[in-house]
Amino acid sequence: MKSDSEGHKSSSKIQIHKGKILLKPRSWVNLGYSIANSEKETFFLKNAIPGETVDTVLLKRSGSLFWGVASEIQEVSSERISSDCSIFPRCGGCSYRHVSYQKELEIKKFLLQETLEHFLSKKHIQIPEIEILSGDPNGYRNTAQIQLGFAGNQRLAGFYEEFSHSIVNLPEEGCKNLPQEMNFAFAEFLKQEVKGSKQILKSKTLSFRLEGTKVISYKKKSVSFSENIRIPELKKIVWEIPAGGFSQVNRYLIAPWLEKIFELVPNNQNRILELYCGSGLIAIALKSKTTSWLGYEISSDCVQQAKRNVLLNGISSCDFKTLNLETDWIDSEEVLNSSFWIMNPPRAGLSKKVLQTLIKTSPNGFLYSSCNHSTLVRDLSLFLNKDYKLSNVTLVDFFPRTKHFEVIVKVEKKD
């Protein structure tokens, strides 16, 4: 698979076909797009495969950069498949329903590899072979938020259109990414609203979470989960998440993700420091790795839940504290001297304060799990030097058929 730097940049002028722009994308790029060029413009295309010739409807412009959707395929790639969703590519939720899932994984691996090489090659950091964890690409989400609105008297319920706040109604059969229980719950809610047995919701969103096979309100109820994971023996762990609290959204990959983290974290640590600890799920799975565990999280509700979760699993010597890692420093030298760090930040990546602390403290090693590979690699490029090696990179496809994916990296000091 060619990178965009290797592909030939067309110097041809823009061609118009049936009132649409005729383009030939040359490579895959981040965020689910392929890229095409004219003499002066660059185009990012949804629903287009490199090598195809496509009629394009432009949706967004910023200077010489354009974003659009391939509406008709004039020259079809052998890699193209028929979409299994009637609202793709109009719906902004999915990016890869025009290729097989195996091809999607290849594309995501290629994009991660290219980003790593772009940021780290100048520092002569050796990049290990990328591993992939994946599961069933259908019905995987345990949380969902549907956009609500009206077009005249017609009720709209679905996801936003690409580059728009126009709502695309869900297909009658529901969203392929959602469990059938959740699709049924959304449909039933709207049916009852039409009948008048439910008051018309004034909110602009409708959010649910899946607890086993039961669908509950995302913002109004806490939820309980359990998983059997090998750490290394098979063990059942249980945890709760407060109403509105964060959880990993892929119900099929929580156990494999935790097992991979367990595999990568070294044994017999004197203390593990976890930043952005959420409700304590990683601590529950990995407490046997260390005599002491300390986690920091901005949400006081999540911190209190993390303390309850370790007790639910009969675990001691774990503590969790509320701290805004964007604005506040960790002021304990003892804590900063923890032998291993684990970080699972939001999409924006590590805060400047955390990154500065990491560089100053230079721990023996750390694990970084992120749903934004661009900010992860950016942070790595600022930290990695001749004293450290990148010993593992694992792509965890938490978000099949979409432009997103999770990445776990392990960094450790050289011998």
UniProtKB/Swiss-Prot annotation:
What Pfam family is a match, any one?
Answer: tRNA_U5-meth_tr
Keywords, ordered alphabetically: 4Fe-4S, Iron, Iron-sulfur, Metal-binding, Methyltransferase, S-adenosyl-L-methionine, Transferase
Tell me the residue numbers annotated for binding S-adenosyl-L-methionine: 248, 276, 297, 344
Q: Where is the active site?
A: 371 (nucleophile)
Offer one example of a GO biological process linked to this entry.
Answer: rRNA base methylation
Q: Does the keyword Metal-binding apply?
A: yes
Give the EC number(s) listed in the UniProt record.
Answer: 2.1.1.-
Q: Detail which positions bind [4Fe-4S] cluster.
A: 85, 91, 94, 175
Family matches, as InterPro entries: MeTrfase_TrmA_AS, NA-bd_OB-fold, SAM-dependent_MTases_sf, U5_MeTrfase_fam
Protein name per the record = Uncharacterized RNA methyltransferase LIC_10086
Organism equals Leptospira interrogans serogroup Icterohaemorrhagiae serovar copenhageni (strain Fiocruz L1-130)
Q: What is the lineage of its organism?
A: Bacteria, Pseudomonadati, Spirochaetota, Spirochaetia, Leptospirales
